[in-house]
Amino acid sequence: MAKAIPKKGSRGRIGSRKSTRKIPKGVIHIQASFNNTIVTVTDVRGRVVSWSSAGTSGFRGTKRGTPFAAQTAAGHAIRAVVDQGMQRAEVMIKGPGLGRDAALRAIRRSGILLTFVRDVTPMPHNGCRPPKKRRV
């Protein structure tokens, strides 16, 4: 089901490494489609610090669209930035997927203080014609 994350330093470089910068505040972007959920954590300037998706968390096929997969993906993305000292974050949620609420609940449980949660799902003002409805 879900992949286990290898422990830090299990296979690392010997010598100088790029220093990890402290990030007290950041922005968490959740893109929840019907097929997958992608969680990206950036600093306030928009540089990507960490990201994860249901696919990279070990889920394949239709399981990627489930709320549990979104919860796991959010946990993987958040774990890396909590180690870098992130305490506060803004959350931007985009898309109609099932993983919206599950990812948000996982972020709330991580201990990061959420300053605000904003829904940034693009809504057309009668733009392009939508695809035809499925007939199953």
From Swiss-Prot:
It comes from the Eukaryota. The keyword Zinc does not apply. The keyword rRNA-binding applies. Its main location: plastid. Signal peptide: none annotated. Part of the 30S ribosomal subunit. PANTHER family: 40S RIBOSOMAL PROTEIN S14/30S RIBOSOMAL PROTEIN S11. This is Small ribosomal subunit protein uS11c. It comes from Lactuca sativa (Garden lettuce). The gene is rps11.
